[in-house]
Amino acid sequence: MSSTSQVALLPKLSLPDGVTVWDGTALEYERRCNNIDEHAVHLMQTINILGIRSKEAQCLNTVLTSVARLRENRQARVYLLCQDGYGVGILKMGVKKLFVTHPSYSSLVEIDPLCVLDFFVDTSFQRKGFGKTLFDAMLLNEGLNPGEVAIDRPSVKFLAFLRKYYGLVEYTPQSNNFVVFHRYFDKWQPQRGKGHRGGNAVPTRSIVRPQNCLRVYPEYQSTTGPNDNFEEDATHRTPPPPLPPPLVPQGSVNSPGPGKKTAYELQYEEYLREQAYRRRQGGDPRLQPVPNPVSSSEIAAASCGARRRMSPTRSGVQYNIISGTPEH
């Protein structure tokens, strides 16, 4: 099929030449707020058509890249390469949690790298440098080196591409069919039995240029090819995920949690109530024997009993290891 007939199946886009990044949130925004002259409709048609062509070219059983899949997986994103107003290539990326064999000590480790899930350049535009332009734009936007990216079931042609342009050769075959090159583990450090993305934990820095009708906002970024010369107008940083709330051990005395009182506070309130009751009875509280308030740590040490005898150093209070009572 000729180049003209293939391109005719794709709608005309109001995007400049270069690479733009799209995820489910960005596409939904375009559909609702920026659908001038059916721009969003043509954009989604282009992604779906290139996803189908990628499936047919790789002889896959299912389509890997589509607007519906991007809406289902909000972490996935597609880099779209345009030339003369038409989409000519797609590169789908997403973070995956993988168990892979470490090349040094041959044991399974857990990693969560950014993965190439689909990579396709239209057959009419192959062997013209578009594939490298698309891949380089992704590396620039994600702030990664080529070896820090994992690939899902790469073809022989894709492996030859990585070897030719990036020198990626050595990798250990994995049971999940993901290719993780040995270079990935140069910066990888295990953390309590788990791995982390080599280099950066989240996509960090992208060079953004406002492009015609393309609106740039925090949900997505746009980049251009590596050979374009342009000024850096803005820098977007993807916010890291929020930190989990601090864990408070159950039964903790010193960290009761929000809205709860310590044992010392409860005892002191009981002491005040007892004083008020004696005043109402007409007695002089100064003549009544009232126990002095003790610290919460002493209360905990006295109430733990046998458990405290097993680990005397866990408490900061000196107590008898036999009886478990505080020493005064």
Curated annotation (Swiss-Prot):
The keyword Transferase applies. Acetyl-CoA binds at residues 119-132, 155-164. Keywords: Acyltransferase, Transferase. Residues 312-328 have a biased composition (Polar residues). Its EC number is 2.3.1.108. Residues 5-185 form the N-acetyltransferase domain. It comes from the Eukaryota. The record marks 58 as: Crucial for catalytic activity. The keyword Heme does not apply. Residues 238-248 have a biased composition (Pro residues). It catalyses: L-lysyl-[alpha-tubulin] + acetyl-CoA = N(6)-acetyl-L-lysyl-[alpha-tubulin] + CoA + H(+). Residues 219-261, 282-328 are annotated as: Disordered. Belongs to the acetyltransferase ATAT1 family. PANTHER family: ALPHA-TUBULIN N-ACETYLTRANSFERASE 1 (PTHR12327:SF0). Specifically acetylates 'Lys-40' in alpha-tubulin on the lumenal side of microtubules. Promotes microtubule destabilization and accelerates microtubule dynamics; this activity may be independent of acetylation activity. Acetylates alpha-tubulin with a slow enzymatic rate, due to a catalytic site that is not optimized for acetyl transfer. Enters the microtubule through each end and diffuses quickly throughout the lumen of microtubules. This is Alpha-tubulin N-acetyltransferase 2. The lineage of its organism: Eukaryota, Discoba, Euglenozoa, Kinetoplastea, Metakinetoplastina.
